[in-house]
UniProtKB/Swiss-Prot annotation:
GO terms for cellular component: COPI vesicle coat; Golgi membrane. The keyword Protein transport applies. This is Coatomer subunit zeta-3. Belongs to the adaptor complexes small subunit family. InterPro entries: AP_mu_sigma_su, Coatomer_zeta, Longin-like_dom_sf. Keywords: Cytoplasm, Cytoplasmic vesicle, ER-Golgi transport, Golgi apparatus, Membrane, Protein transport, Transport. The keyword Transcription does not apply. It is a peripheral membrane protein.
Length: 177
């Protein structure tokens, strides 16, 4: 199993470095305090960078950390120093794109907390026990939709439903303005 792409953890932190959704897949951080110390250190090292348009990568304590910021959420994927950073970047890209779609392009702390169940479903579809399962955002969304995202409709039906909901919101605003 050494050749299977794997990750050590996936972190979603807010703009203050506080946990929104985290999942660890290795025993490199055996206690809650060591996990929180790692999160704090990674956040401190990356917060002054501008990883808003593309993912950035940093070597941190013999780990590759690939990260990206979307609005007030910071996404991190950590892998060992032997891991391929392009695979880590594709994990981050697929996961963050799936979250962006699920939260309807409103990727911020409040929306993430309100939809924490969907975020953890995405995590489960991307990585299982540290082994990378899926990196394509559409495939992740299809699998999550099979778990009950907006009923049991297909992704196309969900897009249509989302478009109709947005149109209703705009129509209601125009009537009451």
């Amino acid at each position: 199993m050494e050749s299977c792409p794997s990750v050590k953890n996936i972190l979603v932190l807010d703009s203050e470095g506080k946990r929104v959704a985290v999942k660890y897949y290795s025993d490199d951080w055996p206690s809650l305090s060591s996990k929180q110390a790692f999160e704090k250190s990674v956040f401190a090292k990356t917060q002054k960078t501008s990883a808003r348009t593309e993912a950035e990568i940093v070597m941190f304590d013999s780990y590759f950390v690939v990260y990206k910021f979307i609005q007030d959420l910071h996404f991190f994927v950590t892998g060992g120093d032997e891991e391929n950073e392009l695979i880590l970047a594709s994990v981050l890209q697929g996961f963050s794109e799936a979250i962006d779609y699920l939260l309807r392009n409103k990727v911020h702390r409040r929306a993430a907390l309100e939809n924490l169940d969907l975020i953890f479903l995405c995590l489960d579809e991307v990585v299982d026990g540290g082994i990378v399962l899926e990196t394509d955002a559409k495939a992740i969304l299809e699998k999550v939709s099979g778990h009950g995202l907006e009923g049991s409709g297909s992704l196309t039906e969900q897009k249509l439903s989302s478009a109709l909901a947005t149109a209703r919101e705009h129509f209601a605003r125009s009537i009451f303005s």
